[in-house]
């Protein structure tokens, strides 16, 4: 039986497979990785009846152009994305996000670009035919960990999919509410007291701009310098996703999914889990303001965030 696959006609800027991530490996220097926007990743799987942790393609800015070979499949794209479906009969459909589509052998999907955002997700019913590495499908290109030899997909590659008897699903879609907020909530970092009162006032009152020097490892911010009154270099300590480090130049860096497991810069704050998807989707040039919240409130906001994701998933069902 011929294997089913997606042929990469254009790889896009950074197309990889991601899931919820790999965990409990920090002690050997392996970070969690995983989808940058977990809510949209999970919803993409829900739209095609997959397990919510099934591997999906994640792309940034410009996505891939893919041709389906030897299969008929149900697919879904989530995010704020421009994309077209090029049918083998030469007709073209303008795609709608958060909606399932049925692709037939020979159809192409052209993921043109993200809109006022960074990441999008492409899920196929049944998932991709690849092995987990360290119990996860996630690819970390910096560490070369994960399927596809830890690398992003390239021109001409075949991305194999699990082939099964696939029938066209009843159309599934949801009305997703996009909120373009620039207020990012944080809790105090472990080195909060390393910074002057003036620096703390600046951090919470002034606006920062997302730099072009941002990727899956971290987001650099441009803005007023933060004065460190203790030491700009400390003994390396463990890092977590969302922690905000301040190096010697005084400009904050938010650590993302592919962050190193340890770091030697003071940590002024940590983005709360409820706001992580939101901050990850801010493109270069976006403005950010930070707001301090208590740990108890951060936990409650996260519960609300999870409930909101589950609400969308129930709407799909």
Model-derived segments and their meaning:
Residues 1-317:
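Conserved "landmark" site that anchors the functional core of diverse proteins
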């Amino acid at each position: 039986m011929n294997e089913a696959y997606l042929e990469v006609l254009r790889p896009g800027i950074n197309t990889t497979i991601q899931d919820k991530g790999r965990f409990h490996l920090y002690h050997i220097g392996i970070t969690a990785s995983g989808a940058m926007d977990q809510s949209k990743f999970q919803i993409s799987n829900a739209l095609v009846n997959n397990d919510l942790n099934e591997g999906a393609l994640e792309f940034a800015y410009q996505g891939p152009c893919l041709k389906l070979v030897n299969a008929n499949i149900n697919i879904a794209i989530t995010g704020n994305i421009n994309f077209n479906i090029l049918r083998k009969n030469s007709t073209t459909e303008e795609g709608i996000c958060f909606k399932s589509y049925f692709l037939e052998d020979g159809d192409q999907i052209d993921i043109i670009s993200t809109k006022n955002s960074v990441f999008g997700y492409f899920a196929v019913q049944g998932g991709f035919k690849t092995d987990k590495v360290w119990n996860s499908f996630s690819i970390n290109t910096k560490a070369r960990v994960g399927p596809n030899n830890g690398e992003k997909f390239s021109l001409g590659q075949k991305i194999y999919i699990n082939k099964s008897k696939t029938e066209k699903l009843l159309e599934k879609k949801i009305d997703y509410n996009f909120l373009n907020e620039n207020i990012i909530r944080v809790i105090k970092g472990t080195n909060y007291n390393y910074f002057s009162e003036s620096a703390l006032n600046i951090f919470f009152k002034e606006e920062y701009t997302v730099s072009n020097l941002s990727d899956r490892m971290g987001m650099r911010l441009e803005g007023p310098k933060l004065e460190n009154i203790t030491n700009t270099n400390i003994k390396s300590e463990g890092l977590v996703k969302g922690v905000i480090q301040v190096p010697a130049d005084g400009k904050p860096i938010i650590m993302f999914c592919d962050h190193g497991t340890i770091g030697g810069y003071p940590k002024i704050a940590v983005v709360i889990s409820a706001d992580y998807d939101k901050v990850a989707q801010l493109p270069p040039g976006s403005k950010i303001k930070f707001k301090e919240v208590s740990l108890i409130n951060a936990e409650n906001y996260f519960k609300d965030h999870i409930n909101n994701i589950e609400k969308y998933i129930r709407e799909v069902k």
